[in-house]
Each structure stands twice: as C-alpha cells, then as structure tokens.
Amino acid sequence: MLSRLRRALRFQRDGIIRSASGLKSVRVQAAVAMLLALNVVLSYFGSFYLSPEIKVSTSFLALSSTAYLFGPIPAALSGALTDVIQYFLRPAGPYFPGYTVSGILGGLIYGACLYRREGKALLVGIPLSKLLINLLVNIVLNTLWLHLLNGAPFFAMLPARALKNAVLFPFEAALMYALTLFLAKNRSRILPGL
C-alpha cells in the first residue's frame, strides 16, 4: 500500500514538473491561451444564473481540457487568468482574490486527476475531479466567498448550492468524459507536434 502511494506521489510530482516545463514551448503557450480565451467566452455565453448566488456554466470544459492536455500548472494559470480577465471585461463590484484562488485550485485538481491519464485511470479521474471541484471549490469555497463579499449567511446558501452541484454532477461528468475522449482520439490532429 505504501509503495503504491509513493508511486502515485512520484507520478504527480513528475506530472507537475513536466507540465511546468511544457510552458517553455511557444506552441503550448499559444494553445493554452486559446483555451483560456474559450474559457472566458464560455463563462459569459455558456452560462446563466438560476439566482444571484447560483450560476450554471460550461466554462469548466475549457479548464478541464487545458488540464488534460497540458497539466496542472498551465490549468492553474489558466484558472487564475480567467478570473482576472473576467473581472476586467465585466466587473461586478470590487475585485476579490478568493475567486482567483478557486480558479487556481480548480486547475490543479483537474490537472492532478486528468493529466497523462488513460483508460481506467482516466475513467476514474473524470468523475473524481468533478466531484472534488464541486465539493471543495463550488460548494465550500465559492459559498464562503459569497458570504464574505455579500454578507449572505453561509449555511443558508449551502443547501441550494449543494443541490445544484449534485443535480449537475452527472451531466457535467458526462460532458467532460465525451470531450476528453474526443481530445484523446484526436490529439495529434488538434495539436500537431505537441
């Protein structure tokens, strides 16, 4: 058991180093920038609000694609930059760095679960990453950020946000699975030379 844990941690460390060194390539930078732009576009045009505190969005697809193709470091940078760019394009109140932290954590979680995964590991990584992000980032952290920003009661918002994430989880995981399979099968055509 301990040897499996060591192998998993070594795999994660190597994946982080590999994904960070991949950012030295201009082609990788350009591809990550295009996925970052797609993330920003999807956050505006691929989302809607059920209430002021509950947003449904498809922008997670661009971030998970960045993580699958390029790893946790480019995905974390993309998550952070997406939040900052969104703020400058359409500010809704003062800038709050908590959402940037959420973007970074989302990219790191997707990257840890999806980068360089194939077969059964990918099949487990997709729902695991979405579950971790829904629980830790969407339900806990983002609810905390809303509480700190708006003064809305944390525990009063929690049930509605948890219900939204629970209902959307199977659909989001299925969309991620379909997109990741498409990327896996067509990677050489989509990103020639990478």
List PLM regions with ranges.
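Loop-helix junctions at membrane interfaces
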Residues: M1-L194
